[in-house]
């Protein structure tokens, strides 16, 4: 697991806990996610319901992107979050010799492709960047302090 992947998981878990949700790193073995917030519903005869699920994209391939979207659709949370770990992807591209300008353009195309793929889903999916996750976590933690 890449560092950026783990960073996103930790922040998502922290945000969910701060919002009062029970959290797990993954949904099930058959449908592994990178994080999930759970809604306990024993009064409905259900053990737990996935309130939000996270899939972190740390590679720049369209195949990986579509695989993450499919995982979110199969889990079927109230909100599926596809997180583009832009910092990790950018670091990897630049480390492999890509210029910063080309890396920025590559990320722009990846976000555009993710937006298009999400728009075709029948699930409620949101596209976040790592910066957006980090900011939401900071705002929630500051509000609680």
Give the location of each predicted region:
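Residue-level signal for beta-strand positions within conserved beta-sheet cores that form or flank
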Residues: 31, 50, 123
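Long, low-complexity, intrinsically disordered polar/charged segments
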Residues: 1-6, 43-44, 50-51, 110-117, ...
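Catalytic cores of nucleic-acid endonucleases
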Residues: 49-115
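Hydrophobic, Leu/Ile/Phe/Ala-enriched alpha-helical segments that form helix-helix packing faces
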Residues: 8, 12-23, 97, 107, ...
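Residues at the C-termini of beta-strands that transition into short coil/loop
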Residues: 27, 57, 131
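Charged, structured surface patches that assemble and position nucleic-acid processing machinery
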Residues: 102-141, 145
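Residue-level detector of flexible, active-site-proximal loop/helix-junction positions
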Residues: 42, 60, 132-134
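Acidic-basic catalytic patches of nuclease active cores, encompassing PD-(D/E)XK
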Residues: 1-34, 38-45
